[in-house]
Amino acid sequence: MPTLRRLDISEFRNLRSATLQPGEGINLISGENGSGKTSILESISVLAHGRSFRTHKFRRLINNDEKSFTLFGQIFEGTTRNIGLSRASNGDIQIRIDSKAAHTATELAECLPLLVMNSASFQLLEGSGQVRRKFFDWLVFHVKQEFKHYWKLYARCIKQRNSLLRRDKITRSELLPWDQELTKAAQHIESMRSEVFELFQTHFLNEIGQFDFTETLGAELSCTYVSGWSKTGNYNEQLEDQFERDVAAGYTHIGSHKSDVKINLARVPAVEELSRGQQKSVIVALFLAEALVFRTTTGRTPVFLLDDLPAELDEKNLRIVGKALKNLGSQVFATAIDPKSILTGWELVDDESLRMFHVKHGQVELKNDITLRDSFLL
């Protein structure tokens, strides 16, 4: 399994200079609000994805007194790989993998598959289909090598088609060549998504069944993949039927860019019926299902970044999550203001493989002496 064995952070937010040597299992990061513990998770995300899970404005990632930040990671997966990323305030970005220049963040993502769960993850239930589609496509991207090719082709066709739709007096015949290419790409995308979703759905239902609250619900919790067009007909023919509507709006209404993963209780969106704690359990089950399908199909396990996991989870459900992560075998980075709930709930007090880090005013300190853990339990 891929694990991050070393992390060097320079001028990233309030972390002026920090070096971490994480363990291959649980890495627990504690600290007060604003101390910088979430920034550690964020730096790993930027290093692995090329982007932050907190902001789209990269200048906010650079320490106020500096003109750039630099991140370096050492990944072990049978052999050691070195990855690095630097970003300057003028927008310049440098990515290096094993001392060679890389051109896209996709190459980083392939080195270190990463799942990030934080407060924004509630958008998987509260947000639009785009949020869930992006979440699910992470899995399809990693387990189906051809997906990237067909998605890029599809995106190019949609962009060109929408551009033509906004032109004066566009005819159906002018769109036809693009529609044919769009249809081919969409069929491949839907085929791959459907195949992966069968596995995902099975694992999700198994994982959510571990939480007791599902037995008290008045209806069955379901997870369904919904295509972006009607499955009763040909996509190309449906594009033709939508022509006048698309011209009037200036964009394409149906297609793989409109697909969704629905989480319902009976026929009602689950978010409208479940408590905040129950929603958190559903979100955990979604992430665990992704990780399990990823492991089943690739033989690898993703790295988990869990920001303030204990929030909204009671002791029993937190224990269920800890057991599932242990069985999965993933490397985990988890933050908590008070690590007591994780230490006790996950039975980590005497675990010699645990790495504990404490962050204060941007300074990171290793708290790995097993005798020190009792101080967090007082």
UniProtKB/Swiss-Prot annotation:
The gene is recF. It is found in: Cytoplasm. One of its GO terms (cellular component) is cytoplasm. Belongs to the RecF family. Disulfide bonds: none annotated. Keywords: ATP-binding, Cytoplasm, DNA damage, DNA repair, DNA replication, DNA-binding, Nucleotide-binding, SOS response. The RecF protein is involved in DNA metabolism; it is required for DNA replication and normal SOS inducibility. RecF binds preferentially to single-stranded, linear DNA. It also seems to bind ATP. Gene3D superfamilies: P-loop containing nucleotide triphosphate hydrolases (3.40.50.300), RecF/RecN/SMC, N-terminal domain (1.20.1050.90). GO terms for molecular function: ATP binding; single-stranded DNA binding. This is DNA replication and repair protein RecF. GO terms for biological process: DNA replication; DNA synthesis involved in DNA repair; double-strand break repair; SOS response. Pfam families: SMC_N. ATP binds at G31, E32, N33, G34, S35, G36, K37, T38. The keyword Transcription does not apply. NCBIfam families: recf.
